[in-house]
Every structure is written in structure tokens, then in C-alpha cells.
């Protein structure tokens, strides 16, 4: 399997530098604890190099635009082969950079098209005590035990044509795992019981966004007017 240091090694090395004396806060979902991209840590380094402000660096196989999530001493991330046929979750020890779990979750015989500026592992996972929830869009969603890496449940029945590749990250609200699917054929929001993976509710949405199948606009529309002096 092809192994590359970018983008994940660079992200992990840059984000998990040594902070003294207190460790940085957990980062459990896309854009952090409150989903707003705000980090409360202060006095962080502004420069990095191979010998400066890097505690460890770990190469991760595959290609992914998803963000790592952090809880306690674990850093979890998703990755995929560049052809989209193998989709994985990886857990790294926060203090040492050692890989704890490297789990191939889904195999996809005929991956959908994915734009070159996207990846087959772009949705960021969401983690809570004892469980992590990962999704790759239509190819599959899974809940894992963070200690053992065991798959607690999975779903592969949310089908849509992602057109340019999946990118929507899940969120947790109370007992629900909520996901958004914006396909060119089907669009919907679905809420799952986070403990069992069973569907609690699903809301369909219109797919009329005035694009043709080739991606070219059906018509030109003016959405705003601006005066510039």
C-alpha cells in the first residue's frame, strides 16, 4: 500500500507540537468543540521545522482532506486509497505518534467519481468518550470502539451520487448522529441513534440546484448587486 507523509503527517506534526506545561484541549469534531474553529490555547508556536516545535511526525498511508479529531491521548483520522477502493480509520497516540489502530473499514468495488481537488476521505469524524463515528458518504458510515477498534455498527444504505466526492462531516446532538447527503440525484439529512446506528428520522430535500450532469450551469443567475466607488 502506498504510504505518503502528506497531508496527514504535516497536519499532525504541526498541530501536535509540545505544549508546556498543559496539554491542548480536546478537538472532537470538525472545527473543534463548538464547531466554530476556536481554540482556547494560548502561547502557541508560530514556526515549525524538522527540529523546531515538532514533538513527533508519523506518516499515514493514502490521501484525505478530513481533519484529525482528538480526545484524551488519542488522535483519530480517516484516509483512503487514491482510487477510493479502500477506506480506513487510523488512531495515533497523542503523546508518542505511535499508530494504535489502522483499520480498513470499507472496500468499494466501483468508487464514484471524485474531483482531483477532493479525496475519498474528506468528511471529518466525530469522537466522544469510548466511541468514534466515521463516514465516507455513500460508501459507508461506522461507529468504532475507541479502545479496541471494534466496529460496533455500520451503515452502507445511504445512497446518493456525490458528483464530485463526499465532504459533509457528521455531528452529535444528544443521542443522535446527524449526517447530510448532498447528491446530484438524492439530497437528505438523516439522524441515527448513535448507540445502535438505527434511523430515527430522515428529511428529504429537493435536488433542483440548476446544474446539468456535466457540471455546467443551466442558466446564469444574478444573486446580488453591489455598487463600488
Predicted ranges, named:
Residues 1-5:
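Positively charged n-region of N-terminal signal peptides that target proteins for export
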Residues 9-18:
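Bacterial N-terminal signal peptides
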Residues 22-229:
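Noncatalytic, solvent-exposed loop/strand surfaces
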Residues 8-9, 37:
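A periodicity- and composition-biased signal for non-globular, repetitive helical segments
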Amino acid at each position: 500500500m502506498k504510504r505518503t507523509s502528506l497531508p496527514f503527517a504535516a497536519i499532525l506534526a504541526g498541530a501536535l507540537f509540545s505544549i508546556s506545561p498543559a496539554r491542548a484541549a480536546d478537538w472532537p469534531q470538525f472545527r473543534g468543540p463548538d464547531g466554530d474553529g476556536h481554540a482556547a490555547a494560548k502561547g502557541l508556536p508560530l514556526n515549525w521545522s524538522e527540529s523546531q516545535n515538532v514533538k513527533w511526525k508519523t506518516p499515514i498511508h493514502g490521501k484525505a482532506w478530513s481533519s484529525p479529531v482528538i480526545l484524551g491521548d488519542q488522535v483519530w483520522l480517516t484516509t483512503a486509497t487514491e482510487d477510493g477502493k479502500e477506506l480506513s480509520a487510523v488512531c495515533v497516540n497523542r503523546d508518542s505518534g505511535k499508530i494504535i489502530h489502522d483499520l480498513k473499514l470499507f472496500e468499494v468495488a466501483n468508487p464514484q467519481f471524485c474531483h482531483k481537488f477532493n479525496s475519498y476521505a474528506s468528511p471529518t469524524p466525530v469522537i466522544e468518550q469510548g466511541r468514534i463515528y466515521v463516514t465516507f458518504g455513500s460508501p459507508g458510515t461506522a461507529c468504532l470502539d475507541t479502545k479496541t477498534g471494534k466496529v460496533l455498527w455500520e451503515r452502507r444504505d445511504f445512497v446518493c451520487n456525490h458528483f464530485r466526492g463526499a465532504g459533509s462531516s457528521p455531528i452529535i446532538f444528544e443521542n443522535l448522529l446527524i449526517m447530510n447527503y448532498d447528491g446530484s440525484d438524492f439530497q437528505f439529512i438523516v439522524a441515527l441513534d448513535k448507540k445502535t446506528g438505527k434511523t430515527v428520522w430522515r428529511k428529504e430535500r429537493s435536488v433542483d440546484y440548476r446544474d446539468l450532469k456535466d457540471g455546467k450551469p443551466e442558466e446564469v443567475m444574478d444573486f446580488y448587486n453591489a455598487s463600488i466607488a
